[in-house]
C-alpha cells in the first residue's frame, strides 16, 4: 500500500496545514510534468516531419532539430506554459463536484469571472503552444510574414511582404483548443479530484492512464480541429483582415487558396499538422492534470497522538474536529478508514486513555466527528424527502434553529431510551442534526455565479427562483416553483406567492386583504410564466434535470463513506482490541445514528429517479464516479451495520435502543435486511 509519510504534528493556520500536506506534492507533480516535456517534444518533432520514403534521413533530421538552439528555447517556453497550467490546476481543484441543475445554470457557472479568467489564460497558453509547434514544424508554417510571390507585389516595395495564413491558422487553432480545453474542464468537472478506492503506487496509476490519455487526446483533438474549421470558415476573414491592416500586410492569394473557403480547408497537410499540434497540447496538459490528481489524492498519514501537547494541529483527532481545507479533511477521513482496517498499532492509539486523567480523548474526538457527519447526511435526506413530499414546501424547524456543537456532542453520546415517546419520527429529530457541514446545492437556473442564497446554504437542496416571492411566514420555508408546473394557477399562486396581507402575525392579528393592484400584478406574472413555459427554447435552458438534484445531495458522500467505514471497522476491532471499553460507552449512540440513517436512506431511495442509475462512461479519461456515489453510500452503510452486528452478535440485544431500532437490529442479526 503506497502511502506518504508525514512529519511531526505542528501547529499553524489552515493554510499552513494545507501547504505542509500538499506543498511537496504540488511541486513534485509540476517537476514531473516538466520532465516529461522533452519526451513529448521529441515525439512531436518526429511525427511532424514524417517521411516514410527516406526513414534514415527522417530520423537524423529529427535528431538534429531536437538539439538545435531554437528547439531548446521552445522547450524552456513550453516549460513555463506547463507551470502556469499546473498552477491553475492547483487553484481550481475541488473535492466536491459542481452540479448544475439546468443548462442556464451551467452557462452561468461558465461565465463566472474566475472561469472566464481561466478560459482566457488557457487560450493564450494554447496560442503560445501553437506558435512553438508551428516553428518546430518548419516549412510554410514557421513565419507569420512571408515574401509575396506575385509579380505585381515585386514592383512596389510596400507590398513585398504578405500574410502567411497558414501560420495565422495555426495560432488561432491553438487559442481555440486552449479555450475548448478550459470549457470542457468545467463542463466535465475535470477539476474534481476523485480519490482512488484501491491505493496503488503513483507510477502504476500514471502508467495505467497513459494509453487512455493518448487515445483521448487524439480523438478530442480531431473534434477540436473539426469545430475550429467550421468557426474559421464563417469568421476567419475577421482576424485575417484585422492583422493584415494592423501589420500592413497583403494577402497573397496566388500562393494558396484562402483558408476561409471549403477548398482552402481541404488541405490534408495543414489539417494533419494542426491536429498533431492539438494532440501535443492536450497530451502535455492532460499529463500535468493527471499527475496533480495522482499526487493530491495519495494517502497521507496523520499521527493519532502528538509528540507534544502544544503541537497537535496536524494530528488526526484535531484535524477531524477543526475546520481545515476540505481536501485535508478528506485526506484525514481517508487515513481514518485505512488505519481502522490495516493498522492495529494505530488503532491502539485510538482506544488509548490519556495520562494523567484516563480519558479517551482520541476516540471521543474521532467518533464525535464521524457521528456529526452521519447526522448531517440524515438531515439532508430528511429535508430532501420533506421537500419532495410537500411539493417544494419545507418546515423550517430542521434548519432554522441549528444546535450548538456542544449540544450536538451531548446528544450524540446520549443513550436513547425506549420509554421516551418522541413527538416527531426519529428521522426528523433536530437533536440528531449537526449543521457543521453542508453540501453544495444544485445551481439555480437564475442563480448568479457570484453567490448563493441563504436558503440554499441552509437546506442544501432548495431551488431559488426570482419569479417566486420571498417567504413571509416564519413557520415555512418554501421552494419557488419551477417555470412550468402541473398545478393550477391558484395553487401556484398560493404556494409560491404567499401574500403578506393574508398571513397571520405572531401576535394573532390578521393583516388586511391584498389590494386590486397587487392581485393584478400577481395574475400578470403568472400569465407571463405560463406563456414562457410553453416555449421550447425557454424549456431547453430552464428545464431541471431530476438527476442533478439527486446527485447534489450526495456530492460530498465520499467523506461520509469513509466515516462509515472507519467508524464501523473501529467498533468491530474494539470487540477484541479495546482493553478499556471506551467504545462500549458510545455503542448505543453509534447504532442509533446508523439505524436512523439507514431508515432515511431506505425512504430516500423510494423517491422517483433516486434508484435510476445514470449511464456509466467506461474507458473515459473524465471521471464520473460522483454520479453514482449514492449507491456506494447505501452499500457502505449496510455493510457497516452488518460489520458491527456480525462481530457483536447476540450481545447487541443488551444495548439500550428504541423498539423500532431493536426490530431493525434484529433483522440485521438474522441477515434479513
Swiss-Prot record:
Transmembrane feature ranges: 26-46, 72-92, 116-136, 167-187, 227-247, 262-282
Compartment(s) where it occurs, according to its Swiss-Prot or TrEMBL record: Nucleus, Nuclear pore complex; Nucleus membrane
Perinuclear space side: 47-71, 137-166, 248-261
Residue spans, topological domain Cytoplasmic: 1-25, 93-115, 188-226, 283-673
Organism of origin: Mus musculus (Mouse)
Keyword annotations from UniProtKB, A to Z: Membrane, mRNA transport, Nuclear pore complex, Nucleus, Phosphoprotein, Protein transport, Translocation, Transmembrane, Transmembrane helix, Transport
Official protein name in the record: Nucleoporin NDC1
Family of the protein in this entry: Belongs to the NDC1 family.
Amino acid at each position: 500500500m503506497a502511502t506518504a509519510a508525514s512529519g511531526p504534528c505542528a501547529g499553524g493556520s489552515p493554510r499552513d496545514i494545507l501547504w505542509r500536506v500538499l506543498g511537496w506534492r504540488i511541486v513534485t507533480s509540476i517537476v514531473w510534468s516538466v520532465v516529461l516535456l522533452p519526451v513529448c517534444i521529441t515525439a512531436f518533432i518526429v511525427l511532424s516531419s514524417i517521411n516514410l520514403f527516406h526513414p534514415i534521413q527522417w530520423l537524423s533530421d529529427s535528431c538534429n532539430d531536437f538539439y538545435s538552439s531554437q528547439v531548446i528555447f521552445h522547450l524552456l517556453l513550453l516549460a513555463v506554459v506547463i507551470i502556469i497550467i499546473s498552477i491553475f490546476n492547483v487553484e481550481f481543484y475541488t473535492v466536491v463536484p459542481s452540479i448544475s441543475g439546468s443548462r442556464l445554470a451551467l452557462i452561468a457557472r461558465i461565465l463566472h469571472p474566475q472561469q472566464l479568467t481561466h478560459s482566457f489564460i488557457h487560450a493564450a497558453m494554447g496560442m503560445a503552444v501553437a506558435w512553438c509547434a508551428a516553428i518546430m514544424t518548419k516549412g510554410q508554417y514557421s513565419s507569420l510574414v512571408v515574401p509575396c510571390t506575385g509579380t505585381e507585389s515585386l514592383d512596389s516595395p510596400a507590398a513585398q511582404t504578405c500574410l502567411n495564413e497558414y501560420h495565422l491558422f495555426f495560432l488561432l487553432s491553438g487559442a481555440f483548443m486552449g479555450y475548448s480545453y478550459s470549457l470542457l474542464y468545467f463542463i466535465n468537472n475535470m477539476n474534481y479530484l476523485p480519490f482512488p478506492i484501491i491505493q496503488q503506487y503513483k507510477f502504476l496509476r500514471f502508467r495505467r492512464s497513459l494509453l487512455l490519455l493518448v487515445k483521448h487526446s487524439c480523438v478530442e483533438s480531431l473534434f477540436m480541429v473539426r469545430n475550429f474549421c467550421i468557426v474559421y470558415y464563417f469568421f476567419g476573414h475577421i482576424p485575417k483582415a484585422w492583422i493584415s491592416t494592423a501589420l500592413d500586410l497583403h494577402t497573397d492569394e496566388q500562393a494558396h487558396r484562402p483558408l476561409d473557403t471549403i477548398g482552402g480547408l481541404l488541405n490534408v497537410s495543414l489539417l494533419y499538422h494542426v491536429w498533431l499540434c492539438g494532440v501535443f497540447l492536450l497530451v502535455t496538459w492532460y499529463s500535468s492534470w493527471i499527475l496533480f490528481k495522482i499526487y493530491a489524492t495519495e494517502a497521507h498519514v496523520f499521527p493519532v497522538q502528538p509528540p507534544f501537547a502544544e503541537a497537535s494541529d496536524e494530528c488526526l483527532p484535531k484535524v477531524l474536529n477543526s475546520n481545515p481545507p476540505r481536501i485535508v479533511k478528506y485526506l484525514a477521513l481517508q487515513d481514518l478508514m485505512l488505519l481502522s482496517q490495516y493498522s492495529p498499532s494505530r488503532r491502539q492509539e485510538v482506544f488509548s486513555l490519556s495520562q494523567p486523567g484516563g480519558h479517551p480523548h482520541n476516540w471521543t474526538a474521532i467518533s464525535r466527528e464521524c457521528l456529526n457527519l452521519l447526522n448531517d447526511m440524515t438531515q439532508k435526506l430528511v429535508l430532501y424527502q420533506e421537500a419532495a413530499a410537500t411539493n417544494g414546501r419545507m418546515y423550517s424547524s430542521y434548519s432554522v434553529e441549528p444546535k450548538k456543537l456542544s449540544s450536538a456532542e451531548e446528544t450524540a453520546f446520549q443513550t436513547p431510551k425506549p420509554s421516551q415517546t418522541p413527538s416527531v419520527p426519529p428521522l426528523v429529530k433536530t437533536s440528531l442534526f449537526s449543521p457543521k457541514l453542508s453540501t453544495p446545492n444544485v445551481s439555480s437556473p437564475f442563480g448568479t455565479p457570484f453567490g448563493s442564497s441563504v436558503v440554499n446554504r441552509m437546506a442544501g437542496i432548495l431551488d431559488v427562483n426570482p419569479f417566486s416571492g420571498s417567504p413571509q411566514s416564519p413557520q415555512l420555508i418554501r421552494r419557488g416553483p419551477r417555470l412550468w408546473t402541473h398545478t393550477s394557477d391558484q395553487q401556484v399562486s398560493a404556494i409560491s406567492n404567499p401574500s403578506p396581507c393574508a398571513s397571520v402575525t405572531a401576535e394573532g392579528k390578521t393583516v388586511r386583504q391584498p389590494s386590486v393592484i397587487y392581485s393584478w400584478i400577481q395574475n400578470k406574472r403568472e400569465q407571463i410564466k405560463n406563456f414562457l413555459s410553453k416555449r421550447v427554447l425557454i424549456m431547453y435552458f430552464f428545464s431541471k434535470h431530476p438527476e442533478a438534484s439527486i446527485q447534489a445531495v450526495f456530492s460530498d458522500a465520499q467523506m461520509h463513506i469513509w466515516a462509515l467505514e472507519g467508524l464501523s471497522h473501529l467498533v468491530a476491532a474494539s470487540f477484541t482490541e479495546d482493553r478499556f471499553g471506551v467504545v462500549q460507552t458510545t455503542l448505543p449512540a453509534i447504532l442509533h445514528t446508523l439505524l436512523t440513517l439507514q431508515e432515511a436512506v431506505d425512504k430516500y431511495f423510494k423517491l422517483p429517479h433516486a434508484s435510476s442509475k445514470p449511464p456509466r462512461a467506461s474507458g473515459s479519461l473524465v471521471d464520473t464516479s460522483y454520479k453514482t456515489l449514492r449507491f456506494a453510500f447505501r452499500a457502505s452503510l449496510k455493510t457497516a451495520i452488518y460489520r458491527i452486528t456480525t462481530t457483536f452478535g447476540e450481545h447487541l440485544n443488551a444495548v439500550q435502543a428504541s423498539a423500532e431500532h431493536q426490530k431493525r437490529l434484529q433483522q440485521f442479526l438474522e441477515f434479513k435486511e
